Structures are given as structure tokens and as C-alpha cells.
A protein has these predicted regions:
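Structured beta-strand/loop patches that form or line metal/cofactor-binding pockets in enzymes
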Residues: 1-72, 79-82
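Conserved, mostly hydrophobic/aromatic
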Residues: 3, 74, 95, 134, ...
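Metal- or metallocofactor-binding catalytic centers and their adjacent structured scaffolds
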Residues: 22, 45, 54-55, 70-145
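Short catalytic-loop micro-motif centered on adjacent basic/acidic residues
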Residues: 78, 217-220, 243-247, 269-271, ...
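Glycine-rich, aromatic-flanked loop segments that form ligand/cofactor-binding clefts
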Residues: 126-129, 135-169
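Active-site phosphate/pyrophosphate- and oxyanion-stabilizing loops and adjacent acidic/basic residues
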Residues: 140, 152, 205, 258, ...
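Metal-dependent enolase-superfamily TIM-barrel catalytic cores that perform enediolate-based chemistry
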Residues: 155-264
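Catalytic alpha/beta core domains of metabolic enzymes, predominantly
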Residues: 252-293
Length: 293
């Protein structure tokens, strides 16, 4: 069975859309405001005061969208994607016309075609979001055609239970909900100097005291640090036994990742949220530069 059509469709979620402003987002399904807006969160732009207050002040507010792939018999697959209009244009104007007519079951071939189509301008960044949206929708379609859940098509369940953790600063709520692990967003980065560093340390110390020794703690740094700051903070936080420290460095700086790995070999490092495609993961795994993807 062949692919009949591929199209991007806008989906409307609370607080999204072309006119939605970050400071106006309403999280109607949450008990409390999102941690992204509840206070300072260190990020690559916090060195600039006008964007230091909170992360959504500079990140895109493009509307969410989805991708629908329809087969010749009318069966359809669906997936969601981020970064709205720019990615939707890549889907509709570039990738979709070149995939129509391919087999609905040829997931590997279609993926390879999309990666290769990125050669003129790079297969990472926004192009990778378009690839992912079509790839996921194609897997959804494949599962419907074969009448099997996608996890079975990928080899079946690998485990009976999944390790789950919370993210944010509302620790008392997370403990009330029964989480045994929680990840804190790091509020301050190098631009905040010694005072910010000390506040980061105090946050972890206070949280460890609150949750006790049997709850895992992690720290999300969202690409905000340089190597020196990352090493210094990791050394200060060593007594609090963090399960991992996440995304301390800019994603593309592999030399910095290598330096960090050498200087704090005792600390579990996690990253990969902002790596796109397979190449960065292959590179990092072959060194190895980090412990967790």
C-alpha cells in the first residue's frame, strides 16, 4: 500500500497559537503554574539581562501542529511536532511531495530519504523536526495497517516497569504524588557570578534535606554553562549525590563535553535533548562523552 498524501495540520492546545505570548500561557490541566514560568531558569540567553528573567521570554511561540499521512485505502497515521510554521513548511513544501507514492511500510527507506534530502542545508535543526513528525506519523500508519501496536513492531516491551521522575521546583507536591526521583531546573548560570552559584548550591542542599536520602535528585542545566562553571558547580554539589547532571553545555560543543567528562569522571552526565539525527549520538557514544542520552 502506498502513501497517498502527507500534510501538516494545526492543532490547538491551551496557551498556544500564533498570537500566544509566553507570559500569558495558561496551563489549565496543571495544579500549579509550569516550572518554566515559575522562576529563573538558567539557559543559553541568561547572560543577556533582557532575557534573563525566564526562559520563554526568548524561545519561539510558534503554534503546535501535527502531521497526517493517508494511505491509498484511507487509513491514516498522525504525529505531533514543535516549531509550527517553519517546520510545517518543510513538511508540506519539501518532504511530502517527494515521499508520496512510497510504500507505507517502508519506514527505514523514507527516513533515509528525508535525511538525504537535508543535504543541501543540513539535516539537523528544523529539518530534523520535520523528519521526526513524518517518521512518527508513518510508524503510526504502519501499526494501523498491520493491526499491531508500534512497540511490538519495534521489538516488543523491553521491561515491565519504567523509572519515572518529576521536573520542577514544586518538590513538596511531587513527593505528595509519590515520585521517588525529581529533577530541579538550575536557576542560575555563569552570568550570575558567585551569588548565583551559591544560590544553586543552597537550592540543592535544601531540596536534599527536604526529600531525604532515599529520593533521587537530578539537575537540569539546559545548556547554560561553560566547562569551568560546570566543574565548579559539580564539585560543590558532590556531597548531595545527584543521580545525574543534565545538559550543562551547549549541545554542539563536543570539545567542551570531552573536557567536562575528563574533569568530573565521578559525576553521571546526561545530554542529547538538543542533538538531532544519529550522528551526534554515535560520536558521543564512541568516546564516550556522556553516560545517559
Amino acid at each position: 500500500m502506498k502513501i497517498k498524501s502527507i500534510r501538516a495540520v494545526q492543532i490547538n492546545l491551551p496557551g498556544t497559537g500564533p498570537l500566544a505570548k509566553p507570559s500569558k500561557i495558561e496551563y489549565k490541566t496543571a495544579r500549579r503554574p509550569s516550572w518554566v514560568e515559575s522562576g529563573p531558569v538558567a539557559n543559553p540567553m541568561t547572560r543577556y539581562p533582557r532575557y534573563a528573567e525566564y526562559r520563554p521570554s526568548w524561545t519561539p511561540s510558534w503554534p503546535n501542529f501535527g502531521v497526517v499521512i493517508e494511505a491509498e485505502d484511507g487509513t491514516w497515521g498522525f504525529a505531533t511536532a514543535n516549531h509550527g510554521r517553519p517546520v510545517a513548511a518543510i513538511v508540506d513544501d519539501y518532504l511530502a511531495p517527494r515521499l508520496i507514492g512510497e510504500s507505507c511500510l517502508a519506514t527505514e527507506k523514507c527516513y533515509d530519504m528525508m535525511v538525504r534530502m537535508g543535504a543541501p542545508f543540513g539535516a539537523t535543526g528544523l529539518h530534523s523536526y520535520a523528519i521526526s513528525a513524518i517518521d512518527l506519523a508513518l510508524w503510526d500508519l504502519k501499526g494501523k495497517i498491520l493491526d499491531r501496536p508500534v512497540y511490538e513492531l519495534l521489538g516488543g516491551p523491553a521491561r515491565d516497569e519504567l523509572f519515572c521522575y518529576s521536573t520542577g521546583g514544586d518538590t513538596d507536591w511531587y513527593m505528595e504524588l509519590g515520585f521517588l526521583a525529581t529533577k530541579l531546573p538550575c536557576p542560575y548560570g555563569p552570568a550570575d557570578g558567585i551569588d548565583g552559584l551559591q544560590k544553586n548550591i543552597e537550592l540543592i542542599a535544601r531540596t536534599r534535606e527536604e526529600v531525604g536520602p532515599k529520593v533521587e535528585l537530578m539537575l537540569d542545566c539546559w545548556m547554560a554553562f561553560d566547562v569551568e562553571y560546570a566543574v565548579r558547580l559539580a564539585e560543590e554539589l558532590r556531597p548531595y549525590k545527584l543521580k545525574w547532571m543534565e545538559e550543562m553545555l551547549r549541545s554542539e560543543d563536543f570539545d567542551a563535553h570531552a573536557q567536562l567528562r575528563q574533569r568530573i569522571p565521578w559525576q553521571t552526565l546526561a545530554t542529547g535533548e538538543h542533538w538531532y539525527g544519529t550522528v551526534p549520538f554515535q560520536h558521543a557514544a564512541s568516546r564516550p562523552l556522556v553516560d545517559l542520552f
